């Protein structure tokens, strides 16, 4: 991409892992299930609650330093009861780690790391706030439209993968029989859950006006609002680590930045500089 030209793209991401935990079989692990269950099934299962878990890896598809601008989450309901109760299925950000081959209604990590409460505890295991919700009724696809919270979740996972514990899906009528629906999992073969992520990369900074004055080298470059930049140098063109000269964040408006190297030119044989966008400003 040429300097000065912005870049926008959309990535479609399928789950890195998904499963569901069920109150009906509190010690059971459902890794590899082709369908996930959300809500209470009724019948012989009674009012036992079911909660799917999803984990996506945006860093595998989206470059570091990207700014997330939109997120849409799609699920496909594969089975609905004939007289089912409609409800809103809410996505909540998970706050603690879980393992797809170990997690159960009781445990998030085997053999003994429990959820804060069985099935997960709001405020401890998952967020009190709902990142997005959709009214679920009949079979078919459902799209969770982009919200500020969905964007913030995915941006956080991209910037700091160590915070990525995914989402839990909870029906707002999960205590009511026949609120449950089955949905295709990552193992379904078709109709997989999907995360559609819009993102932009900052305008590549163009170094302008390299200048030598009183034995000191300086350079200028234009920033884009909402991004941070690093000015770095090293004394060999091909080898050795880059050293940070300065970091700049332009949070509100674009601006022209002057970066000056305090080391006199006379103290070295050569020096090479680069300017890079390091990510969205916070």
Name these PLM-found stretches:
Residues 7-61, 172-174, 186-192, 198-200:
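Flexible, small-residue-rich N-terminal segments that precede or flank a structured functional core
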């Amino acid at each position: 991409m040429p300097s000065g030209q912005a870049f926008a793209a959309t990535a479609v991401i399928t789950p890195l892992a998904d499963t569901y935990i069920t109150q009906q079989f509190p010690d059971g692990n459902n890794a590899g299930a082709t369908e996930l269950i959300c809500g209470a099934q009724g019948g012989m299962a009674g009012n036992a609650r079911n909660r799917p878990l999803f984990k996506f890896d945006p860093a595998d598809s989206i470059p570091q330093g990207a700014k997330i601008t939109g997120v849409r989450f799609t699920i496909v309901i594969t089975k609905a009861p004939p007289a089912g109760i409609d409800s809103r299925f809410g996505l909540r950000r998970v706050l603690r780690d879980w393992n797809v081959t170990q997690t159960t209604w009781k445990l998030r990590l085997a053999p003994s790391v429990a959820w804060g409460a069985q099935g997960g505890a709001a405020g401890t295991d998952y967020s009190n706030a709902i990142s997005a919700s959709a009214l679920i009724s009949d079979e078919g696809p459902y799209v969770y439209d982009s919200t500020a919270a969905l964007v913030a979740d995915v941006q956080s996972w991209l910037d700091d993968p160590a915070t990525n514990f995914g989402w839990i899906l909870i029906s707002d009528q999960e205590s009511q029989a026949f609120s449950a629906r089955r949905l295709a999992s990552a193992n379904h073969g078709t109709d997989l859950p999907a995360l559609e992520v819009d993102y932009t990369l900052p305008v590549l900074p163009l170094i302008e006006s390299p200048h030598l004055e009183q034995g000191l080298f300086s350079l200028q470059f234009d920033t884009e609002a909402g991004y941070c930049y690093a000015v770095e140098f090293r004394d060999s063109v091909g080898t050795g680590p880059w050293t940070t000269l300065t970091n700049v964040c332009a949070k509100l408006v674009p601006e022209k930045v002057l970066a000056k190297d305090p080391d006199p030119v006379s103290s070295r044989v050569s020096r090479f500089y680069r300017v890079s966008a390091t990510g969205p400003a916070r």
